[in-house]
Amino acid sequence: MTAYILRRLLATLPVMAVVAVFVFFLLRIAPGDPAAIIAGEDATAEAISAVRAKLGLDRPVLEQFALWLWRLAQGDLGVSIFSNLPVTRLIAQRLEPTVALTLSTLFVAVALAIPVGVIAAWQVRKLADRLVMIFAVLGFAVPGFLAAYVLIYIFAVQLQWLPVQGYRPIAEGLWPFIEGLILPSIALGVTYMALIARITRASMLEVLSQDYIRTANSKGLATRRVLLLHALKNAAVPIVTVIGIGIALLISGVVITETVFNIPGLGRLTVDAVLKRDYPIVQGLILVFAAAKVLVNLVIDISYAFLDPRIRY
């Protein structure tokens, strides 16, 4: 197992290198000039050129890339063009809200979707199953930002049960912290819940058709025991796989969700940096997102060995 983990970690290096090259040059060919934004709308060409020289943007692109790679190899993601603060510090300051939102969404989605999928498989072609399939279709069809605005309108504007926007750190109290995450977690997790519920249903249906499940039922074992100890355990690998894929989608989805709910996390920082053409922040954030996705995939692959004894690395 240790050798497999080391091989996977080494295999991530080329992936991260490709991401770094792609991000750097894509930003350079994208329209917009951070020097022009800093200089202002009425700035002269000479003023803009002076700002570009100060930022080092007047150097050849390959020279800029080599300098950035050298700093990156030393763990330095650079300095923000606008705030003049280290990118690592900015990311660290915004990390807590994003991690809290991602974990809360993951908890809500898994806690709701897996039981729903199991019930749908057990009650196949009955009312419960049809309701779950309708929810799955709607979950895939409704965009996350639309779900966010609908939830805000119903539960924050009309019913006034929850705050419209805003994130409260856990240091300010547990309930304000949870209260600020309820709507964003549901909005971000709608598609995720639909995906997990549908895969859980499909995987459970396949397992429930096996002979050993019919044998367990014929012996008079309790339905809960059959479903949880025999069926769900053997259906876990596909479910865990889709949970891992969904986490990668959640990491990308926080950009829109944090913007809608005004959460000061990495997603909001990404939007602000892209609009300002703050190259160091965008480059650093995309590398962090890519590394998180690679790490999640590694954890999911390792979990297979614990879920299925037949899998060995």
Stretches found by the model and what they are:
Residues 43-76, 182, 213, 262-272:
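Short hydrophobic, aromatic-rich alpha-helical segments embedded in or entering the lipid bilayer
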Residues 58-114:
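An internal, D/E-rich "acidic patch" concept
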Residues 15-66, 82, 159-180:
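Hydrophobic alpha-helical transmembrane segments of membrane transport/permease proteins
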Residues 2-3, 13, 92-130, 144, ...:
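Alpha-helical transmembrane segments of integral membrane proteins
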